[in-house]
């Protein structure tokens, strides 16, 4: 961040890679095949996998990334991208809710913002915005501001969300 931060207008901190069952890092949103390969032991325990993800996200939020530390946190619950494919449809358990609350309280204390975007709606195996309505409600109650974002990686995504 220190090397390139001065050349950017806006940065978003997000978690895309997580250590898998074999200790290697895998992209959580690349494909269902990679997700299955990486997180096989957790595929029957949605809340354990989500807890692993949110624990890593908390470390990222707490990390000192220097002068250009991103103010905004993107798709806080990206781990749910393939939720319908893997049957991850249960509500978050109490342990995950507590951890998310801790993350949001840290964000509030740091003056951070939560990126709010619709891209998950357009993912056929997700069909939910990032973050979920539940997390949005927690953030609102705790006073963490939302910033509308597109999180678009293509013109087509922008047109669908805002066109």
PLM region descriptions:
Residues 1-107:
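Extended substrate/RNA-proximal surfaces in nucleic-acid metabolism proteins
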Residues 76, 86-163:
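Charged catalytic cores and adjacent phosphate/nucleic-acid-binding surfaces used
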């Amino acid at each position: 961040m220190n090397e390139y931060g001065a050349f950017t207008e806006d940065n978003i901190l997000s978690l895309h890679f997580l250590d898998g069952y074999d200790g290697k890092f895998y992209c959580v949103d690349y494909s269902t095949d990679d997700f299955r390969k990486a997180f096989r032991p957790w595929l029957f325990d949605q809340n354990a996998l989500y807890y692993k993800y949110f624990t890593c996200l908390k470390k990222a939020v707490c990390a000192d990334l220097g002068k250009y530390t991103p103010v905004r946190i993107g798709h806080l619950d990206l781990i749910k991208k393939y939720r319908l494919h893997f049957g991850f449809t249960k509500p978050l358990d109490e342990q995950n809710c507590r951890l998310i609350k801790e993350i949001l309280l840290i964000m509030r204390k740091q003056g951070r913002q939560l990126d709010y975007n619709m891209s998950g709606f357009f993912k056929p195996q997700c069909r939910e915005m990032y973050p979920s309505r539940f997390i949005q409600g927690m953030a609102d109650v705790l006073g963490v501001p939302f910033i509308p974002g597109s999180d678009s990686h293509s013109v087509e995504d922008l047109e669908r969300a805002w066109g």
